[in-house]
C-alpha cells in the first residue's frame, strides 16, 4: 500500500512539472509575440515593407545556393 502511495505522489509531481513547463512556454511565447507586434507597430508600414523585401531576397538567395 505504501508503494502505491509513493507512486501516486511521484505521478502527481511529474504531472505538476509538466503543467508548469507548458505554462512557462505559453507565457514566453505570448511575451515574444507581444514584443514582435510592438516592434512592428513602432516601425511603421514603410519599414515593414523594406524588411519584408529584404527577408524575401534573403530566403530566395538561400534556396538558390
Swiss-Prot record:
Keywords annotated in UniProt: Cell inner membrane, Cell membrane, Membrane, Signal-anchor, Stress response, Transmembrane, Transmembrane helix
Cytoplasmic topological domain: 1-18
Bilayer topology annotation: Single-pass type II membrane protein
Residue stretches in coiled coil: none
Ranges that cross the membrane: 19-39
Keyword Nucleotide-binding appears in the UniProt entry: no
Name recorded for this polypeptide: Two-component-system connector protein SafA
Organism lineage: Bacteria, Pseudomonadati, Pseudomonadota, Gammaproteobacteria, Enterobacterales
Amino acid at each position: 500500500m505504501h508503494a502505491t502511495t509513493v507512486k501516486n505522489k511521484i505521478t502527481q509531481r511529474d504531472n505538476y512539472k509538466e503543467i508548469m513547463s507548458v505554462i512557462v512556454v505559453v507565457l514566453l511565447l505570448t511575451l515574444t509575440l507581444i514584443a514582435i507586434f510592438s516592434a512592428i507597430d513602432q516601425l511603421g508600414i514603410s519599414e515593414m515593407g523594406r524588411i519584408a523585401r529584404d527577408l524575401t531576397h534573403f530566403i530566395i538567395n538561400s534556396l538558390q545556393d
